[in-house]
Amino acid sequence: MKIRNSPSFHGGSGYSVFRARNLTFKKVVKKVMRDQSNNQFMIQMENMIRRIVREEIQRSLQPFLSSSCVSMERSRSETPSSRSRLKLCFINSPPSSIFTGSKIEAEDGSPLVIELVDATTNTLVSTGPFSSSRVELVPLNADFTEESWTVEGFNRNILTQREGKRPLLTGDLTVMLKNGVGVITGDIAFSDNSSWTRSRKFRLGAKLTGDGAVEARSEAFGCRDQRGESYKKHHPPCPSDEVWRLEKIAKDGVSATRLAERKILTVKDFRRLYTVNRNELHNIIGAGVSKKTWNTIVSHAMDCVLDETECYIYNANTPGVTLLFNSVYELIRVSFNGNDIQNLDQPILDQLKAEAYQNLNRITAVNDRTFVGHPQRSLQCPQDPGFVVTCSGSQHIDFQGSLDPSSSSMALCHKASSSTVHPDVLMSFDNSSTARFHIDKKFLPTFGNSFKVSELDQVHGKSQTVVTKGCIENNEEDENAFSYHHHDDMTSSWSPGTHQAVETMFLTVSETEEAGMFDVHFANVNLGSPRARWCKVKAAFKVRAAFKEVRRHTTARNPREGL
C-alpha cells in the first residue's frame, strides 16, 4: 500500500520532509524505528560520557580541592597573631608618583628590594628553606592599611584590571629570594592609572608562592598616564631645568608665565633672584600665594645641585675688597688685598652684598677652576693705602671695622700669621676723610702690650714704625671710655722697619652699647720726630672725625641711644 498525498501524513507528524509519493508504510515504519534507536543510543552515550568526564575531572581536581578546603578552614580559624613568624618586607618603595608603562623603581632609581625577616626580631633570615623561595608580585588597593592581616584579607585587597583592560600589573612578576633577599630587576609596570580607585593610589604587594611567610606591602603611590610624564617634576632639579620643573609651578601656568616675563626661565635664574631679592621673587609668583606653597617652591629649588666650579667675583667700591660668589650669587668669601677676612660683622657683610647686588653688571665670571680652592691667586687688589696702623701683642685681638657709606676707604683687614707669631690687625687709611673701627671689649685687657703706628712711603716703599706701651685709666668725658697713655723715650734716629719709642700718645677707646664693642680714637699725640708726629696727628684727626660722624648717624637712627 502506497501513501500518496495523505493529509494525515502531511499533518503535524513531523515527517513532511519525506516525499510522500516515494514512501510506503513499510519504509516509514523502518525509518521511525531506526530514528528511535539512534536517539536512544545517543542519549545513552551522552550519559555515559558525562559520567566518565565527571569522574576524571573530580579525580584530577581532588588534590587541589582538598588543599583549598584545608586552607579555607585554616584561614577561618587563623588570627593575625597565630601566623608564621616569618614575613616579607619591602626595604624601599616606589616614589609617591609613577607613570603607566614606566619601570617601577625606588625613589633614587635603584631596584626595589624585598627581604625575608623574622617577625619577632626583625632580622634577616638568610638560611633555611624559605630563604630561597619564589615571591609573587601583585597590585594592591591603597586602602589596605591594616597593620596585621590574614591570608584571606590580603587576597581580598588584590586588585584586578578594569573591564576591557590589560592585566593591571605587567612584566616579570616573580622574584627568587637569594639568602633571604630578592631584587626586583624585571621591567614590571602598571598598565592603567590609579584614578579609578577610591584612594586614587596603588600599593605593591609580595607573597610567597607557597604558604610560609606574612605578605609584604609597599607604601601607597599614585599612578598617572604616561602622557603626563613630560610634566614630571625633577628631584632634585638641575640648574638648567625649566622653572616649571619646580613643585607648585605648573607648566604654562600663571606663575611660570610671570616668571618668564621677567626672564626667569631656569631654576638657576630662580635661585639667583631669590638670593638677590626674595621679596621681588615672591611678588612675581603672586602675593596671594600661601606660605605653605611658597615654602614648597623654595625648598624644592634649594635642593638644586650647583656647579661648584662656577664662581663670580665682584670688586667693591672700597679699594682692595673683593667678593666671591657661587653660581647663584651666594657669598662665599670676602678678600682684602688677596687675604681672606674671617669673622666679619654681619652688618658689614650685608652692606657689601647689597652693593654687589645693586651692581650685578660688575659681577664677572671666573673661569679658572683653581680659583675655587685658592681665591687669593685670582683676586687682584689695588695698591696699599698710604697710612697704616697696626695693633699687636695679643693672641685674640678681634679688631673689626666697617665702611662709611660716603667713603671709599677700607676700614680693616685681618692679617694672617703663623702659630708662633701673634696675629696683627691692620687698619688702613687712604686719602678719604672717614673711617671707623671697633674692638671686642672682651679682648681689651690683653690689648695693652704694645701699639704700633706705621706710615708707608709710597715712593720708596718703606715704612716708619713707632711702638708704645701704656696703661688704662678713666676718661672724664665718658664713663664708658678708657685711655691708653704711653710714655717712652724716643730714640734719636729712625730707620725703616725699626721700632722707635714715643714720648706721649693717647689712645681713647669708647664703648658702644649696641654691639658691645669699643670705638678707637687717637688724640693728643706728641712725638719727638716731626715725621712721626705728623703720622700720629694725621691718624688722630682722621679717626676721631670718622667716629664723630658715625656716632651722629647712629644717634639719628636710634634717638634713644643718644639719651
Curated annotation (Swiss-Prot):
Keywords: Abscisic acid signaling pathway, Activator, Calmodulin-binding, DNA-binding, Hypersensitive response, Nucleus, Plant defense, Transcription, Transcription regulation
GO biological process: abscisic acid-activated signaling pathway; cellular response to hypoxia; cellular response to molecule of bacterial origin; defense response to bacterium; defense response to oomycetes; plant-type hypersensitive response; positive regulation of abscisic acid-activated signaling pathway; positive regulation of response to water deprivation
Null mutant phenotype: Reduced basal resistance to Pseudomonas syringae pv. maculicola ES4326 and P.syringae pv. tomato DC3000. Impaired systemic acquired resistance (SAR) induced by P.syringae toward Hyaloperonospora arabidopsidis Noco2. Plants lacking both SARD1 and CBP60G fail to accumulate salicylic acid (SA) and to express PR1 and SID2 upon both biotic and abiotic stresses.
Conditions for induction: Induced rapidly by pathogenic bacteria Pseudomonas syringae pv. maculicola ES4326 and P.syringae pv. tomato DC3000, by the root-colonizing endophytic plant growth-promoting fungus Piriformospora indica, and by microbe-associated molecular patterns (MAMPs) such as flg22 and hrcC in both local and systemic leaves in both local and systemic leaves. Accumulates transiently in response to 12-oxo-phytodienoic acid (OPDA).
Superkingdom to which the source organism belongs: Eukaryota
DNA-binding: region residues: 147-263
Gene Ontology MF, one: sequence-specific DNA binding
Annotated phenotype, changing V29R: Impaired calmodulin-binding and reduced resistance to Pseudomonas syringae associated with loss of salicylic acid (SA) accumulation
Pfam families given in the database record: Calmod_bind_C, Calmod_bind_M, Calmodulin_bind
Primary localization class, coarse: nucleus
Start and end residues of each stretch annotated as Calmodulin-binding: 1-76
Family classification: Belongs to the plant ACBP60 protein family.
Annotated function: Transcription activator that binds DNA in a sequence-specific manner, 5'-GAAATTTTGG-3', to promote the expression of target genes. Recruited to the promoter of ICS1 and other defense-related genes (e.g. PR1, PR2 and EDS5) in response to both biotic (e.g. Pseudomonas syringae pv. maculicola ES4326, P.syringae pv. tomato DC3000, and microbe-associated molecular patterns (MAMPs) such as flg22) and abiotic stresses (e.g. UV-B, drought and abscisic acid), thus triggering rapid defense responses by stimulating salicylic acid (SA) biosynthesis.
PANTHER family in the cross-refs: CALMODULIN-BINDING PROTEIN 60 G (PTHR31713:SF43), OS02G0177800 PROTEIN (PTHR31713)
Subunit structure: Interacts with calmodulin (CaM) in the presence of calcium ions; this interaction is required for defense responses.
Entry protein name: Calmodulin-binding protein 60 G
